[in-house]
């Protein structure tokens, strides 16, 4: 499908079924979201499918599924196990969104401030300022989420970008002080046409 067609089909779909995604489809989704698309990116680091401030690659992409939570390792294009068990409900954040609690994939966007402030190469002006940091990591998250939306549209999948239980997820994932949970994104097959 062309990019223009994917853009035409891009939309938020909140009615998401519980049918599991095939492994290759999940693999392609994660690569499209935040994968390595070139070895020689800016500042002698691999480039990604979404831009980031000073190529800091400060967003960590966690994947919550029925069997556990994983961290997407873009360099090796694999999922590293983080936590066993079903924690998808934390990724949606509220009982008012229970209708997607059993969707097969819940992405969890986590910023690592250390990566943002300790990049090699060019440093964006003001990166030590917390408000400037927030503006960059929110934009960078949006770029990744946009890739997810376009991939979902191209594959006939449903996707919904939303808030999540930030405190609950941070505790379960045992995040470091310089890491922050930002948002969730639910992906699966549409439950309605």
Could you say what each language-model-derived stretch is?
Residues 173-193:
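A glycine-rich helix N-cap at a beta->alpha junction
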Residues 85, 121-132:
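Short, surface-exposed loop/helix-turn segments at secondary-structure junctions
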Residues 37, 70, 114-116, 192:
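Short, acidic Gly/Pro/Ser/Thr-rich loop/turn segments
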Residues 1-105, 173:
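N-terminal amphipathic, basic helical "cap/leader" segment at the start of enzyme domains
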Residues 2, 6-14, 113-126:
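Residues forming anionic-ligand binding surfaces in small-molecule and nucleic-acid pockets
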Residues 10, 29, 61, 105-118, ...:
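Small-aliphatic-rich amphipathic alpha-helix that forms the alpha element of a beta-alpha
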Residues 64-66, 110-112, 188:
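Structured loops at beta-to-helix junctions and adjacent beta-edge loops in soluble globular domains
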Residues 102-104, 157, 178-180:
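Short coil/turn connectors at secondary-structure junctions
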């Amino acid at each position: 499908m062309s990019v223009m067609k994917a853009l035409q089909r891009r939309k938020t779909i909140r009615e998401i079924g519980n049918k599991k995604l095939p492994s290759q489809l999940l693999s392609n989704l994660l690569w499209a979201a935040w994968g390595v698309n070139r070895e020689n990116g800016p500042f002698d680091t691999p480039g990604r499918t979404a831009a980031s401030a000073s190529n800091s690659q400060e967003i960590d992409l966690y994947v919550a599924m029925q069997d556990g939570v994983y961290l997407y390792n873009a360099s090796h294009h694999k999922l590293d196990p983080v936590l066993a068990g079903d924690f998808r409900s934390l990724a949606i954040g509220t009982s008012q969104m229970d209708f997607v609690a059993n969707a097969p994939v819940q992405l969890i966007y986590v910023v690592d401030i250390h990566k943002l402030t300790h990049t090699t190469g060019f440093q964006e002006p003001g990166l030590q300022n917390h408000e400037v940091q927030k503006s960059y990591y929110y934009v960078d998250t949006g770029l990744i989420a946009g890739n997810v939306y376009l991939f979902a549209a191209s594959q006939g999948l449903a996707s919904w970008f939303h808030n999540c239980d930030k405190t609950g997820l941070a505790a379960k994932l045992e995040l470091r002080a310089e890491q922050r949970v930002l948002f969730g994104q639910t992906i699966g097959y549409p439950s309605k046409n």
